[in-house]
A protein has these predicted regions:
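Predominantly cytoplasmic-facing regulatory/coupling regions of multi-pass membrane proteins
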Residues: 1-91, 150-252, 277, 282, ...
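Membrane-interface alpha-helices at helix entry/exit sites of multi-pass transporters
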Residues: 84-88, 103-106, 117-134, 275-286
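Transmembrane alpha-helix interface/packing and boundary motifs in multi-pass membrane proteins
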Residues: 92-101, 243-264
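Membrane-embedded alpha-helical segments of transport systems
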Residues: 96-100, 124-144, 250, 285-297
Length: 340
């Protein structure tokens, strides 16, 4: 492949996010063209307090599950850090990448800052990010495959493009699962070299752990929206999870940060026309606030406190060093004089 072709592919991928965002924004406007902002605001306020509380609990459990991605990845590279450290790095990394998109760059930067400080090598951090990415895709792929058989296909009959997209997504996810598990079964003891890094192929046991963790994370994230949505529309949880997995996966593949606009459009298109779209969009906005905005504020504040504490601790160490070093130097000098 020539250099020009590689550059062209990179440009297409980088601009695809803008294209899908504009497309999703247009479809979103079309779905909501008959509603006002006050209708959507009333929909958010109409969500019962108990539902919002349960959504917040599901969100907290979801981010705890996300932090286990880092725990699993650390075990893969043989790294050892305290439990609170990988929890902080995992939750903060995902709080940033969920909002900013491009998880390897946005979430990877904060992980690199933290893990290098905790004596994890840069190459191992890259491996951790790769394993975490596979963990997410395994879980999401498993849910998409299961949901394909559980979600009524009549849901997407009104849109030929959506129907084709769902079938393509199902095939992609199924192939991903089959190839990954086949690789872990038959090539477990082998490794793959990419650049200067050597990746040991995970065991089948680890592949199962990755898939289960990815499914758990997706279900908990889905529960956040489900609790916001149920006051307005009655939908079986299994069918809902299918729609959620499809919408979430579509948002990820679109390259739009946080899948914003794309995720909402899939839901609005999939749900029946008899449902009040303003209520659905209000529930989706509440989900965005609970699962994206609040964790970013909370984890960002916690990281700020940690950085301040670390800085004050380093300042304390420097002050102690300034006091102790001159005393030690004078003691060494006096010992030298005595020996002379």
């Amino acid at each position: 492949m020539s250099v020009q072709t590689k550059r062209l592919i990179k440009r297409v991928i980088s601009y695809s996010g803008i294209f899908f965002f504009i497309l999703a924004a247009g479809m979103l406007w079309w779905q909501l063209r008959n509603y006002s902002l006050s209708d959507i605001a009333h929909a958010i306020l109409d969500i019962p307090f108990m539902n919002l509380t349960m959504a917040c609990v599901a969100c907290m459990l979801g981010y705890l599950a996300l932090s286990l991605y880092d725990c699993l990845a650390l075990n893969y590279v043989g790294g050892r850090v305290s439990w609170w450290k990988w929890m902080l790095a995992g939750m903060l990394g995902f709080a940033i990448s969920n909002n900013a998109g491009h998880a390897v760059v946005s979430g990877g930067a904060i992980r690199y800052r933290l893990y290098t400080r905790w004596r994890i090598r840069g190459g191992d951090i890259v491996k951790m990010l790769t394993i975490s990415g596979f963990t997410y895709f395994l879980g999401a792929s498993a849910i998409v495959v299961i949901s394909y058989f559980l979600v009524p296909h009549a849901v997407f009959q009104n849109s030929v493009g959506a129907s084709i997209g769902i079938n393509a997504l199902f095939i992609f996810c199924l192939v991903t699962l089959l190839v990954y598990f086949a690789t872990t079964m038959f090539f477990h003891k082998k490794s793959i070299k990419i650049g200067q890094l050597k990746f040991q192929i995970p065991s089948t046991r680890m592949a199962f752990a990755q898939t289960i963790l990815g499914i758990t994370d997706s279900i908990l994230a889905g529960l956040v929206l489900y609790f916001c949505l149920t006051p307005f529309v009655k939908i079986p949880f299994v069918v809902f999870m299918g729609l959620f997995a499809i919408a979430q996966s579509t948002g990820v593949f679109s390259q739009v940060p946080g899948g914003i606009g794309v995720f909402e459009t899939v839901f609005l298109v999939a749900l029946p026309d008899t449902v009040d779209k303003a209520n659905i969009f209000g529930a989706l906005l509440a989900y965005r606030i609970i699962y994206y905005v609040l964790p970013l504020i909370g984890m960002g504040s916690l990281f700020f406190i940690y950085e301040r504490w670390l800085r004050s601790r380093m300042k304390h160490w420097l002050n102690e060093a300034k006091e102790k070093i001159p005393a030690k130097i004078s003691r060494i000098k006096s010992e030298i004089r005595i020996r002379k």
